[in-house]
């Protein structure tokens, strides 16, 4: 009974604020989302359609260490803030209005935030975080070739069992820090220039667009996987994705000695460099990395000039990686 009273006291201000809105028609779109199954529903809006104007405030108002789900609805707009989903804020579901219509933007860099891992616009440490139809952007200027400390992370995800559906990730160098944990990305748009998906997560990317904005006369890179030891179960897998852009990229480079990256049934445009992969200046990693391609197609998928340590995988070899079982998704998705 005490919990029930506390819960009512938390949600009643939201209801009372919504009732005071003078122009309810402009806010109808926020009332069309199904809320069944959520213990709490919080609304964020720059236009007076919710209790909060900042996403961080809504996250802070959610119940900590909860076994039930909280829904955070984020209205149209550009939210110029940096927010953190702390470790005790689990089971959050964040719903935007479309990744081209709802975005979180900040502009830190490695230099301005004392390290690449701290340069994020958004960081997720809590478990079972889910985001729909929202963009995460780092708007720091594109670095010149050879620039030092210009890395700029849009999203850092550390919490286990995180999923992103129809989301956008925008930056230049080091856009998406897929640091650790099991993660699922479905129908997302990911843009960057160098190492724009990096970290040591165990993650499946399905039906995503990977868009290179590397500068002309340079070679960018999509992935920099951080698998450090043979026993790690981590790696990045891309299934039914599309690689586009305006300048050449490698599929991956060996940030750590046991880097593991697989592309399956992915369209590769001409932006993919003919050699495909890079050892990051350390030939020893050629014996330990696991770089695989499986049934990929398009002008960038020609394997005839690939580096010798890249693998063309058979259906049997690819099978352990190309479905949600790679991330134990049948247990949590």
Curated annotation (Swiss-Prot):
Coiled coil: none annotated. The keyword Ribosomal protein does not apply. It comes from the Eukaryota. It catalyses: [(1->4)-alpha-D-galacturonosyl methyl ester](n) + n H2O = [(1->4)-alpha-D-galacturonosyl](n) + n methanol + n H(+). The keyword Secreted applies. Pathway: Glycan metabolism; pectin degradation; 2-dehydro-3-deoxy-D-gluconate from pectin: step 1/5. GO terms for cellular component: extracellular region. This is Putative pectinesterase 14. Glycans are attached at residues 108, 114, 133, 302, 323. It is an enzyme of class 3 (hydrolase). Belongs to the pectinesterase family. GO terms for molecular function: pectinesterase activity. The record marks 173 as: Transition state stabilizer. Residues 1-16 form the signal peptide. Substrate binds at residues 116, 151, 253. The lineage of its organism: Eukaryota, Viridiplantae, Streptophyta, Embryophyta, Tracheophyta. SUPFAM superfamilies: Pectin lyase-like. Acts in the modification of cell walls via demethylesterification of cell wall pectin. The active site is at residues 174, 195. InterPro entries: Pectin_lyas_fold (IPR012334), Pectin_lyase_fold/virulence (IPR011050), Pectinesterase_Asp_AS (IPR033131), Pectinesterase_cat (IPR000070). It comes from Arabidopsis thaliana. Keywords: Aspartyl esterase, Cell wall, Cell wall biogenesis/degradation, Glycoprotein, Hydrolase, Secreted, Signal. Expressed in flower buds. Its EC number is 3.1.1.11. One of its GO terms (biological process) is pectin catabolic process.
